[in-house]
């Protein structure tokens, strides 16, 4: 359950290490984001020479959450950390590599490029 002010690890090679959620997209009163949901965030920690700098406002998609997520078959999935992948304006990932596993829900939400770059889809 990602909400405003939540901090997430960045799971790609854009140069950002941590982002802070500004807004959950998808409706005016939407409070929480789960796996596959898009957020607006600001970069809180970045490495020198990366594609993004500290203070940049970016869009990102949530790929891992600590809060368990219920699937249609009745099973639950949860991860050890909250993580996101930074997106371009057209919805494609800004980085060229994805680190760590991602949820299968991304395939249903049409983030096929992220699914294909990820080392593991759970």
Curated annotation (Swiss-Prot):
Pfam families: Ribosomal_L14. GO terms for biological process: translation. Disulfide bonds: none annotated. This is Large ribosomal subunit protein uL14. Belongs to the universal ribosomal protein uL14 family. Part of the 50S ribosomal subunit. Forms a cluster with proteins L3 and L19. In the 70S ribosome, L14 and L19 interact and together make contacts with the 16S rRNA in bridges B5 and B8. Signal peptide: none annotated. PANTHER family: 50S/60S RIBOSOMAL PROTEIN L14/L23, LARGE RIBOSOMAL SUBUNIT PROTEIN UL14M. Gene3D superfamilies: Ribosomal protein L14. One of its GO terms (molecular function) is structural constituent of ribosome. Binds to 23S rRNA. Forms part of two intersubunit bridges in the 70S ribosome. Keywords: Ribonucleoprotein, Ribosomal protein, RNA-binding, rRNA-binding. GO terms for cellular component: cytosolic large ribosomal subunit. InterPro entries: Ribosomal_uL14, Ribosomal_uL14_bac-type, Ribosomal_uL14_CS, Ribosomal_uL14_sf.
